[in-house]
Amino acid sequence: MPRVKRGVTARARHKKVIAAAKGYRGRRGNVFRIAKQAVMRAGQYAYRDRRNKKRTFRALWITRINAAVREQGMSYSVFIAGLKKAAIELDRKVLADLAVRDKAGFAAIVQQAKAALAA
């Protein structure tokens, strides 16, 4: 069986890692052993933060809704309870968007929630 030299394969593998580390500072961008670790860590951060992003955005939407609802003289938790009672099935993303872009429309939804709680 002939001897297999791995020069081509190794070079391709190294190039792939170095390309992934493009833009990294210092030796993290041009030394294979260090770049490999940096790329792996970057992947771990990306994996973790794809999950954290969902939490962060939900928190942002809730904060925006709460601020807009308090202008109408209500708290967030009472507002959400009113929406449930009024059978309004808008998610927090849409509610936050309405609160920012369409204040009159959002105020109408708040009034419906208030009416449902009063009934």
UniProtKB/Swiss-Prot annotation:
Q: Which GO terms describe its biological process?
A: ribosomal large subunit assembly; translation
Gene3D superfamilies attached here? 6.10.160.10, Ribosomal protein L20
InterPro entries for the chain: Ribosomal_bL20, RIBOSOMAL_L20_CS, Ribosomal_protein_bL20_C
GO MF, one term, reads: structural constituent of ribosome
Q: Does the keyword Transport apply?
A: no
Q: Which UniProt keywords apply?
A: Ribonucleoprotein, Ribosomal protein, RNA-binding, rRNA-binding
Under PROSITE patterns, the record lists:
RIBOSOMAL_L20
- Annotated GO CC locations: ribonucleoprotein complex; ribosome
Output the SUPFAM superfamilies linked to this UniProt entry.
Ribosomal protein L20
What does this gene product do?
Binds directly to 23S ribosomal RNA and is necessary for the in vitro assembly process of the 50S ribosomal subunit. It is not involved in the protein synthesizing functions of that subunit.
UniProt lists the family membership as follows: Belongs to the bacterial ribosomal protein bL20 family.
Protein name per UniProt = Large ribosomal subunit protein bL20
Annotated organism of origin: Bordetella pertussis (strain Tohama I / ATCC BAA-589 / NCTC 13251)
Instruction: Give me the gene this protein comes from.
Output: rplT
